[in-house]
Every structure is written in structure tokens, then in C-alpha cells.
């Protein structure tokens, strides 16, 4: 219970202080502009979290009865699914966010592309921790890194003030990214692999970097394709949306079609579709 309380306090320091610092340094107007983008990201995150919330119970069952090798296999599958969904949403957000805000609220409410990108990076970094946090929770590894979460919050506040005064809203969001990267983004996977699976964590970090490279490459290709689109705002948005749906997923299928995790998820998806067909 003590570890959970400390983790909650750290979470508040990381997640709930940015708006206070933004309004203090840049004013309420900047907070309001940023809130439109935060709303989009929170909506995406809520949808994706429904998927991973359903997985947590299954992971708990696997951890209770299966071998360590089976646990690691399921971890890799969930981590792969995690990457696919969050990388796809991150790419789509960067390309579509300003168009959505322009259509819904007007062009005067859009933020610079650098702020959109750093917001999306924070979304991706947190999202990529889902598999790790799921296993950390179901394995009961709360004690590992409990004080580091508070450290993340303290670093975030200090850097947000320093970088916020220098670069404004971008600096505050960059501070959040840095505070996570230097603490729990590397330590939580380390704890799960070393103390949960009794395994070398370097394989995870190698996979993380591989997925990151694929994500950046996919984003670059998708963005080039989207930049070709011309026309009025609504028509451009529709075409960009189609591009964001098709190109990342097609590229992921081409790149990962032979990977064990993809094959497993494909077979599972086929099984679900067949069950739905029988019911209908």
C-alpha cells in the first residue's frame, strides 16, 4: 500500500503540474490552446486503454499458471500490439491535429507544429509503457522504482520552470519528456525483465529502438504522402485521414508480417472474426 501511495503522488507531480506551470509562465490563454490538443490525446488514450484494461486480467491468469517462457512470449505480443496502436495514433495525431482544431475551433486556435510533435512524443512514450506497467502490476513489483516516480515528478517541475521560461509551452512539454526518459521509461522495463522474468533487459531495449526506428520511418513516409494533398480544408482533412489509416498499417504489415507476434495476433483476430460471423 505504501508503494502504491508513493507511486500515486509521483503520478500527480508528473501529470497534474504542467497546466499549473503553463498558466503561470505563459498565461491562461496558452493553457486553453493546449487543452484542445490534450483533449484529442486523452480521447485517443481512453480508447486504447480499454483494450489494455481487458488484457490485464488475462495477463494475471497467465502469470499465475504458465511457465516463465510463456509469460515472456505474451509480454512480447502485448508490447508489439502496444507499439502498433500507439505508433499509429501518434503518426495520425501529428498529421491531423492542427486540421481537426482548425475545423472545430478555427485557425487562430492552432499551435505550432513543434508543440504538436512534442505532445505526440509524450503520448507515445507513455503509451509504450503499457505492456511494462501491466506486467509490473500483475507481478506485484510495486516496490521497484517507487521513489523514482517521485523523482520523475520533481525533475519535471524543475525542468518545466527552467525550460518553460526559455522556450514557453514547448519547453514545458519537453521537460515532461526528459523527466520520463531519464527515470521510469528505462527503469520500469529493467525492473520487470530483471526481477519479474529474471531475464536480461537488453533484448527489450533493442526491440524498443527497433520499433522506434520503424515508427519514425513510417511517420516520414506518411507525412510526405499527406503533404501532397491540396484543396479546401475539409477535403484535405478527409484525404489525410484516409492516408493516416492506410499507409501506417500497410507499412507495419509489410515490415512485421513474418514476426512471431504479428502472426499470433493475426490468428487471434481471425478467430474473433469467425466467432462473430457464427453469431450473426
Could you tell me what each predicted segment is?
Residues 1-15, 20, 58-73, 191-209, ...:
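Interhelical loop/hinge segments that connect adjacent transmembrane helices in multipass membrane
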Residues 7, 11, 15, 34-53, ...:
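Transmembrane helix-bundle signature of multi-pass secondary active exporters and lipid flippases
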Residues 4, 21-42, 108-114:
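Interfacial/gating helices of multi-pass transporter permease domains
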Residues 48, 72-127, 157-161, 165, ...:
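Alpha-helical transmembrane segments of multi-pass membrane transport and lipid-handling proteins
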Residues 199-200, 223-280:
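Membrane-proximal transmembrane or re-entrant/amphipathic helices at the cytosolic face
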Residues 37, 41-79, 133-138:
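Helix-loop junctions and terminal segments of transmembrane helices
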Residues 120-152:
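Membrane-interface junctions at transmembrane-helix termini in multi-pass inner-membrane proteins
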Residues 143, 150-185, 189, 193, ...:
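Membrane-interface helix-loop junctions in multi-pass transport and translocation proteins
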Amino acid at each position: 500500500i505504501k508503494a502504491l501511495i508513493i507511486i500515486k503522488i509521483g503520478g500527480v507531480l508528473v501529470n497534474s503540474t504542467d497546466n499549473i506551470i503553463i498558466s503561470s509562465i505563459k498565461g491562461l490563454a496558452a493553457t486553453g490552446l493546449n487543452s484542445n490538443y490534450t483533449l484529442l490525446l486523452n480521447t485517443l488514450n481512453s480508447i486504447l486503454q480499454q483494450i489494455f484494461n481487458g488484457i490485464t486480467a488475462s495477463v494475471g491468469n497467465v502469470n499465475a499458471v504458465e511457465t516463465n517462457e510463456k509469460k515472456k512470449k505474451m509480454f512480447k505480443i502485448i508490447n508489439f500490439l502496444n507499439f502498433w496502436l500507439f505508433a499509429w495514433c501518434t503518426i495520425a495525431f501529428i498529421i491531423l491535429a492542427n486540421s481537426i482544431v482548425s475545423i472545430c475551433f478555427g485557425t487562430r486556435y492552432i499551435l505550432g507544429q513543434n508543440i504538436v510533435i512534442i505532445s505526440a512524443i509524450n503520448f507515445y512514450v507513455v503509451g509504450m509503457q503499457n505492456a511494462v506497467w501491466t506486467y509490473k502490476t500483475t507481478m506485484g513489483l510495486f516496490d521497484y522504482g517507487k521513489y523514482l516516480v517521485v523523482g520523475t515528478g520533481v525533475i519535471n517541475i524543475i525542468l518545466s520552470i527552467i525550460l518553460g521560461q526559455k522556450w514557453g509551452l514547448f519547453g514545458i512539454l519537453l521537460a515532461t519528456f526528459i523527466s520520463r526518459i531519464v527515470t521510469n521509461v528505462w527503469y520500469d522495463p529493467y525492473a520487470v525483465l530483471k526481477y519479474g522474468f529474471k531475464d536480461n533487459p537488453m533484448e527489450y531495449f533493442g526491440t524498443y529502438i527497433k520499433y522506434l526506428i520503424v515508427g519514425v520511418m513510417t511517420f516520414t513516409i506518411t507525412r510526405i504522402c499527406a503533404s501532397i494533398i491540396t484543396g479546401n480544408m475539409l477535403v484535405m482533412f478527409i484525404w489525410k485521414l484516409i492516408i493516416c489509416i492506410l499507409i501506417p498499417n500497410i507499412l507495419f504489415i509489410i515490415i512485421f508480417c513474418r514476426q512471431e507476434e504479428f502472426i499470433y495476433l493475426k490468428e487471434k483476430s481471425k478467430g474473433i472474426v469467425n466467432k462473430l460471423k457464427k453469431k450473426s
